[in-house]
Swiss-Prot record:
Superkingdom of this protein's organism: Eukaryota
Cellular component per GO, a single term: nucleolus
Protein name (record): Condensin complex subunit 1
Compartments (UniProt record): Nucleus; Chromosome
Note: Present with 2540 molecules/cell in log phase SD medium.
InterPro entries: ARM-like (IPR011989), ARM-type_fold (IPR016024), CND1/NCAPD3 (IPR026971), Cnd1_C (IPR032682), Condensin_cplx_su1 (IPR007673), Condensin_cplx_su1_N (IPR024324)
Keywords of this entry: Cell cycle, Cell division, Chromosome, DNA condensation, Mitosis, Nucleus, Phosphoprotein, Repeat
PTM-bearing positions, type Phosphoserine: S464, S475
Molecular function GO terms recorded: histone binding
Primary residence: nucleus
TM regions (residue ranges): none
Role: Regulatory subunit of the condensin complex, a complex required for conversion of interphase chromatin into mitotic-like condense chromosomes. The condensin complex probably introduces positive supercoils into relaxed DNA in the presence of type I topoisomerases and converts nicked DNA into positive knotted forms in the presence of type II topoisomerases. The condensin complex probably also plays a role during interphase.
Recorded family membership: Belongs to the CND1 (condensin subunit 1) family.
Amino acid sequence: MSGFSLSEYLTKFQTTDRESYPRLQDPSRELNVIIDQLAVSPEQIDASPDSLEALIDLCHDFPHLTPKLQTQLSYLISSSLSNLSKDIKANLSSNVNFTEIGGLIPQWKRHLEEYGYLIQVLLTFLQDELHKVSSQSTNLNRSAKNSKNDSANVELFKRDCNQMENLLESITKLLEINLSKIFQTTPEKDLFIGLFTRPLFVLLEIEPVTKVSSLKMFIQRILAMCVKNHGQSSSIQSSLMTNLTYFLHLSVFNAELLKLLNDEYNYPQLTEDILKEISTRVFNAKDTTGPKAISNFLIKLSELSPGIMLRQMNLVITLLNNSSITLRCSVVEACGNIVAELAQDPQTMEHYKQQIAVLIELLEERFQDSNPYVRTKAIQGCSKICDLSSKFNKSKAKFTSLAVRSLQDRSSLVRRNSVKLLSKLLLKHPFKAIHGSQLRLSEWEEYLKGSESQLNSTLKKVESQETLNDTIERSLIEEEVEQDEGQCRTELEGSFNKSAELSRIENEVENINATNTSVLMKLKLMIVYYKDAISFIKEIHKSIELISNLLFSKNRNEVLESMDFLVLADAFDIELSEFGIKKMLHLVWMKGTNDEGTSISVHLIECYKQLFLTAPDSCNMQEKAAHIAKNLINLSIGASIADLASLEQLLGMMYEQKLIDQHVINILWAIYNSASKASMQKEQNVNNRDSEKGFSKEQIHGSIIILGMLSLADNEIALKGLESLLNIGLGAVGLKDLTLCRYSCLALERMVPKRSTIITKAINQELEDVAVKKLYAIIINYTKDNEYYPMCEQALSALFTISSKPDILATDLIREKTMMTFGKPEEEDSILSLEQSSRVVSLSQLLFIVGQVAIKTLVYLEKCEAEFKKRKIEAETRNGKVKNQGADVTNTTQDNGGDKELEMIGGTNEDDFTDAIQFVKENELLFGEKSILGKFCPIVEEIVSNSSRFSDPMLQRTATLCLEKLMCLSSKYCEKSLPLLITVMEKSPDPTIRSNAVLGLGDMAVCFNNLVDENTDYLYRRLHDENLMVQRTCLMTVTFLILAGQVKVKGQLGEMAKCLDNPDQGISDMCRLFFTELASKDNAIYNGFIDIFSNLSSDDLLGKESFKKIIKFLLTFIDKERHQKQLNEKLVGRLRKCETQKQWDDIAFVLNNLPYKNEDVTALLEQGFKVVSAKE
């Protein structure tokens, strides 16, 4: 037996350089000797003076031992300690009388200290090696092996972990002993237990170790046993708090340890003490690790031990006053986690009912936190509560109103999470019990009306019953009073009988009252239920209006969430969802993806597929096709021009993805063909109510609109329905329904493929002749219906697309329409007769045709030019290939003979052809001897310049349009007629004419830039036209011209800037978009800022607040410091020359709002108006 002093050995080990320990000559032999000794009994560790020292030397030399010897040594010590612990525990538990084992305690103590020291030495060396390995390798705990070095490190890590597990297992056996019986004083016991806990806390600093589940389990169990059974709560608390402050990866570990302590060892005190300490801790402003680690810990603890955390929540909540956003976020998230965990069990929820209510209230308060991340955590906490099966109906109602309010938050993160919360609230709404899950407001209002009327009728019935009861009782009393005293016996008997009768009546009344009370209560509850539902639906309606505006957010994730919400709202049959879904249609033009790579347009297709291309499972193929066709038609009904353009793009994409099949197209054609049948029924039997109910006019229009859109993606669709188009749309039905005729013309035009040329024919000559004849007829047809003009425009477009000789046909058209308008009939039944019709209407139609033919001729000539260039390139390429291949003369002759046209092109100079086309446009179309268009120039000028004489509004509109289109043909005519058009744009009382004049001037700016550029001031004036439509038209026109580079931006940007504060939201939004786009073009805002500022500052009609609002917006685009500095210098120069207080104030406002600051400028501004007065 040797004298072993634990403190001495421990101090020596901690202060000695570990590399200085002597190497053993033959460690294997010495280890085998010790193994033999300890095999007899673990108490043989110090049987001889040399055995203990030999074992200690082996442990000190542990790093230099072979892997095999290391494993043997660690196993020997761990197994010996385990066996010793078992023996001691057995003796302590079996011997009740302490005096019997009192003599053994000093020996046990010495042996435990010896083994404890050896364990600590091994733990220290192992944790050093693990730390070294983990710092060298990146592949620990992973299957991938990037190199041989990593592979060796992984193997070493696993071996060390296995040895560590053996040692830790022996420690758990040791800690099962009641050490207080062996170590008489607390310092002795603490020193002994510290042999194990200190190395373990150092070991925990190695992150890969905490990912080995078996090691983590042993460490947590050891620490828990030390706390519970051996009074180490204070020291372990201190170590845990240190770890929490410096090591992020230990947040989850510590939370799991505290859960183990609470669940298996029934020791929640440590958790509570740690939470108390956290709540009072003050963090350094520069410290980011500490708050983050504490936050992760609180969040994990709230998930694992919500009950314990709830008890200390009053202290934890104080962290909400902390400046650290991370800590505030964690507290808010913890609140949500606690409620979510506790509310899963009904009994627990009932027990913590009040505390849960307080936490929910806290979450609601945090919706108004100053930081968006904290607000987001509050929203996410509410989302977790909404996922629960427990009913929080009152809370959900509050969540709904808060979420709707948060949709207007400045942070896109908050808005996106608000949309998610609303989706959950809608998905799990509590109003499904009686009338199903649908939430159509009109239906619920009807339910409420029904219940209220039922309640009123029930109340009246109850009142009438009460009155009857009072009457019966009163009559009985009166009869008793009037009884004669002489008839006492009879009276008593009668009284008895009457009392019995009265008792029976009272019982019936009580039953009736009980029934009435139950009915009344039920009705009142129903009314409350309906009112709550209606309130919820109205909140959802508000949210839809706001979410519809989020569809065009710059944040792609927000857009996708908004789309999904609108689809969900439609599934619940909420009326207003249609508004959002229609608005969603315009996202088809949006490019880009979200963080996960989801394309906006692809997601839009998925949404519309779910909404409109998915039929009930119970339907057969024909029914599904009909369902989809009707849905598509409904999309077109009531749609604006912008809606139809977006729908056309979307349907094209859907068709390309084969989401719309031939069955649907067949149904659409069937609906379109029903127009003929409906027309015949109407003519034959107008009042026959028994006739089969057909499709409405809107549905028939919708069918051909959709078919026209699909034909753009696949021209075969229109080609296959050509006969129907000619017989119905361009036949008798179309003549009576010009809208149907218009869209039929559009579909007819689209049977020509998009990539076709003017030479390629889409249909054979016979079908072309029929189609052209029909188009010709509907164009010259006289009607007073104003739908004629859009129909005529489409018909002429189709004519120029389909016909192989559109110029000749157009000439004939104009001649015949002219004869119809001005000519005299040769016969009474002549087709040209206009006996009962207005020549003014006919003239309006004629001028419209002339103008449209002028533009279409111009387009036709440009197509000819483009086709010439294309075929010339093809000819040159072909000839070059023939020469290179050395083809024989015979083949070359045959090729050239087969394509004489190409030969002609090959011999023509490209510039000559372009000049010829330009000559035709400039001189022949309007000024040629045989020019039919030129004949109308004087007529149009006369009508436009004499509006008092030709006062018909439609005639004036068509004449102005015609003038504009003729001006686009020739720069000569444009220059001549430009003053007339500007006069009309300035002075016409008709806003439609002024709008058309603005558009015409825009077109001319593209065609003849040099002519219009000098007169753009007149165009900019219309930005402040008294009519809103003219303002919008002008803003769109100028926006296009500037962004496309068609006009030079001079001093007119100031006029554009004034539109930023326009009362009309649409105009101000459009103007914002313009400046946003302009800012991306070569510092355009910076270059034009001084001119804009001068314009705004000198405008006395512009309010002070409006000026500030506009300037603030524009300054956001000047973000380069160099530009800010230069602008600052320019404005300071102006500041010194100011003559009025207003000028000085305006410049000072800009300088104060510029991010660039200068001390001289600040001093100058502080002097204020003194500078001005000195000048004066």
